Amino acid sequence: MNANRSEGTPATSDPLGGTPASTSSTASMHANPANPANPATPANLTTPPILEVSEFAVRYGKVEALHGARLRVQAGQIVTVIGPNGAGKSTLLNGLMGALPITGHASGHIAYLGESIEALSIEARVTRGICLVPEKRELFSSMTVEDNLQLGAYARKKRGERHYMSELETVFGLFPRLKERRRQAAGTLSGGERQMLAVGRALMGQPRLLMLDEPSLGLAPLIVKEIMHIIAKLRETGVATLLIEQNARAALQVADYGYVLETGELALEGPAHELAHNPRVIDTYLGLAKKPVPVL
């Protein structure tokens, strides 16, 4: 898949079985990602983004793992970044969180709610409402489900029983299974339940921006569908979601807007439903499926 943004011929038929992609739709997927005239949702036209990233790069010594990244996420919007293993997806999230290893160095501009945050510590970013659910979930296995959730509230320095109980009921509303297992040790949960707990713990801090690193990793298809359905429901809360996924089909089903990351460069972008019908994305990431990717 060529990383050249200007490349691309409009599709004359839809390999997924949907309506043919128009010339204008195909062209929009190669527009400058920093261009506000290339919206993912109507909100882009009237509201400033929660997150706006420009010319973002990450180096490990002399190796540039990520270069020239530009993306934006609106309130209540789900933006996905798909791509193969080793493309730099986790590096992107860790760089945005300020969580790179000591050998990593980030450059470029990160604006969160209009504020430059490149110099802020991880703790300061969390306090401002940015939460990352890492690929390995990083739960406390010997602690109960509820104790793990309580730690999420502490991350934002929340005080008072009223705040805590309100946040807890919100999370239990999204994840009824966690409520059933609230006194159970996290280490005894299934893989899907552990992922639910990791997301729930992040939500306990009432984030404005939630970043998810491969939430479908290692999960059965039915559990992936359940997790993605819950992520889709986050739109109702106004939380902005940046979803990193290798499972392109699942990600494009739930997202409003998407980017394709290859060898450290954002090579393609567009509304998720258009990316799902783009021949290059179909051939490389969706296989030869004959039915359109539904939108949750």
Where are the model-predicted features located?
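ABC ATPase C-loop
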Residues: 202-203
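ABC-type ATPase nucleotide-binding domains, specifically the catalytic core motifs of the NBD
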Residues: 61, 101-102, 120, 145-166, ...
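Helix-to-loop junction immediately C-terminal to a conserved catalytic motif
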Residues: 97
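Conserved ABC ATPase signature
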Residues: 185-189
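Conserved catalytic motifs of ABC-family nucleotide-binding domains
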Residues: 206
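The feature captures the beta-strand-to-loop junction immediately N-terminal to the Walker
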Residues: 82-84
